[in-house]
């Protein structure tokens, strides 16, 4: 699952974990993992991690608009859903992976239960209104399959 974590959705964790547990039961191969790929507020935060390490508050519509403006400042043709501009940004994905990993590590001092992809960690991420992205974990996983 990929979704933006927003303050309005904090109470939806119990619904989400029910769906996740249902999908886990439906797996034919128990080694297949059901992953949550989350980014705080909006996808533009993940895109900005391709350019810099930062973790601003992204709780309001104004915050999301600011994030969109930051992406447009570094990629002027960017619009949501535009393949060409997103592909240009994606070329810098190794930087985004490093920056996203650092944002997660920095959250340990705020109470993040650990870096491992567990239900406890994901519940914490979904309910604390901190800025982060776990998209890097899927990319690292896929890169590991190539080896």
What does each model-identified segment do?
Residues 5-147:
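C-terminal accessory helical subdomains adjacent to catalytic cores in phosphodiester-
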């Amino acid at each position: 699952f990929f979704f933006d974590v927003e303050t309005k959705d904090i109470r939806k964790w119990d619904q989400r974990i029910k769906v996740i547990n249902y999908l886990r039961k439906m797996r034919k191969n128990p080694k297949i993992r059901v992953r949550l790929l989350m980014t705080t507020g909006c996808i533009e935060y993940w895109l900005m991690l391709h350019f810099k390490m930062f973790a601003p508050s992204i709780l309001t519509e104004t915050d999301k608009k600011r994030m969109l403006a930051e992406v447009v400042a570094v990629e002027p043709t960017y619009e949501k859903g535009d393949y060409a501009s997103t592909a240009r940004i994606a070329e810098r994905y190794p930087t985004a992976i490093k920056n996203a990993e650092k944002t997660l590590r920095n959250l340990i001092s705020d109470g993040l239960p650990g870096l491992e992809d567990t239900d406890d960690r994901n519940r914490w991420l979904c309910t604390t209104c901190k800025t982060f992205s776990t998209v890097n974990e899927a990319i690292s996983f896929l890169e590991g399959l190539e080896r």
